[in-house]
Amino acid sequence: MELKMEEISEYLKKQIADFEKKADVSEVGIVTSIGDGVARIYGLDNCMASEMLELPNGVYGMALNLEEDNVGAILFGDDRLVKEGDLVKRTGRVMETPVGEELIGRVVNAIGIPIDGKGPINAKTSRKVDVIAPGIIKRQPVKEPLQTGLKAIDAMIPIGRGQRELVIGDRQTGKTAILLDTIINQKGQNCICIYVACGQRRQSVVQVVETLKKYGAMDHTIVVAATASEPASMQYLAPYVGCAMGEYFRDKGMHALVCYDDLTKQAYAYRQVSLILRRPPGREAYPGDVFYLHSRLLERAAKLSDAEGGGSLTALPVIETQAGDVSGYIPTNVISITDGQIYLEPELFYAGVRPAINVGLSVSRVGGAAQIKAMKQVAGMLRLDLAQYRELAAFAQFAADLDKATRALLERGQRMVELLKQDQYVPMPVEDQIMLIFAGTQGHLDDLPVSAIKAFEQGFLSFIRSQKEDIRKEIREKKELDDTLKQKITDAILEFKKTFQP
């Protein structure tokens, strides 16, 4: 085959015309020291705060300390894969996480990588992990109820969509159980739930996922897990990642619920990272910005205005106390940030009162605004009555003869405490809660022995479902009790009591 000179020159001209000068410039630094999940890097002069950095062997980091002569970065991965002298590349992007509907039903780690063995997640969008919370103009007051399905909470410490309600208590008092019941109760409520496991045992996370699968709640839930065996950097980041995933749904006009279990472990992880980065320690060796660590996370929970789509992000953070001390540094910080707290007490838990809520110390600062009118009508004075009952019960231990009114109050209180007990993983529809609390507060249970209350509850609800379904439907639709409806409920209670054998 003979090549003509004209063809060769034409081909060369075409190649020269199509030639593009491509110069790929990337700023590179060198690891000067590495250890305890933190790397010191020299040479990244233009690095941004919270920027993602690319290290060898697929390890990523995030710049936390920007100092004169080096950058302190936390690593998301095994620091044994990185050694002194390794090259570090800037990515030019701050820390991001994959978000979207593709993550629903999956278990991911703190950087959005799936760890449930179901293959990769092809998320179409990503969001910055740490963003500024919505401003005042973008919000509206919390006024829509988020039903937990727990009688004690929905009646006395109501939670609204967009609220931040702290669940606080010692270890093994049922904190996670409240979160799981709330997640299970969101089934069919158009609410996406994100459960963030921070610093927990892997076995505990497996149990949570299995429980959610068993009750069909994984269909609307994302689990973000940063277990105790993972680096402190992952435990520090996980709550922000969970929050960013929730914000995606909030900004689409949907409702989301994020459960942070628990923020005490996040504070421990942040303290560890900060001390290794040589940040000055403050009270209890925490860095000075540990309040900001939690406030900037929890402020992102919001009920957006109608102009912004009307979506909401509700936060249920958990704090673990030591020996019931709510006056510790981290507990007081988070109590002051949130819109109320549910305080769980070991003494009540061991006495068989579950959920073990101390009504006197628990509060919702949103209050009745987050309840439907029917619940406000039946449970308005319940909190006060129960708090009075607790005081009287303590006093009655020393008094031999009590007057009739005091005895009646104690009797009613015992029955209400029994009525508010609830088994785990059986959240109750709000219309059923209203009828039961109505029966208790109107004195229809006063003539029943305390031991028969549970049997009455189960029997009455099955009687209503089989014969008086119209009452449930009416409460659901009207959302308030008029005199006619009250009479219908009273008649149903009296009719059932005729056949009820305690």
From Swiss-Prot:
Membrane topology: Peripheral membrane protein
Family annotation (Gene3D superfamilies): 2.40.30.20, ATP synthase alpha/beta chain, C-terminal domain (1.20.150.20), P-loop containing nucleotide triphosphate hydrolases (3.40.50.300)
Reactions catalysed: ATP + H2O + 4 H(+)(in) = ADP + phosphate + 5 H(+)(out)
UniProt-listed InterPro entries: ATP_synth_asu-like_sf, ATP_synth_asu_C, ATP_synth_asu_C_sf, ATP_synth_F1_a_nt-bd_dom, ATP_synth_F1_asu, ATPase_a/bsu_AS, ATPase_F1/V1/A1_a/bsu_N, ATPase_F1/V1/A1_a/bsu_N_sf
Pfam families noted in UniProt: ATP-synt_ab, ATP-synt_ab_C, ATP-synt_ab_N
Residues under site feature: Required for activity: S362
CC per GO annotation: plasma membrane; proton-transporting ATP synthase complex
Signal peptide: none
GO function term, MF aspect, one: ADP binding
Keywords: ATP synthesis, ATP-binding, Cell inner membrane, Cell membrane, CF(1), Hydrogen ion transport, Ion transport, Membrane, Nucleotide-binding, Translocase, Transport
Enzyme Commission number(s) of this protein: 7.1.2.2
Principal location listed in the UniProt entry: membrane
Cell compartments where the protein resides: Cell inner membrane
Binding site for ATP: G169, D170, R171, Q172, T173, G174, K175, T176
Domain of life: Bacteria
Class in the EC hierarchy, top level: translocase
Family to which the UniProt record says this protein belongs: Belongs to the ATPase alpha/beta chains family.
Subunit structure and binding partners: F-type ATPases have 2 components, CF(1) - the catalytic core - and CF(0) - the membrane proton channel. CF(1) has five subunits: alpha(3), beta(3), gamma(1), delta(1), epsilon(1). CF(0) has three main subunits: a(1), b(2) and c(9-12). The alpha and beta chains form an alternating ring which encloses part of the gamma chain. CF(1) is attached to CF(0) by a central stalk formed by the gamma and epsilon chains, while a peripheral stalk is formed by the delta and b chains.
Protein purpose: Produces ATP from ADP in the presence of a proton gradient across the membrane. The alpha chain is a regulatory subunit.
Protein name: ATP synthase subunit alpha
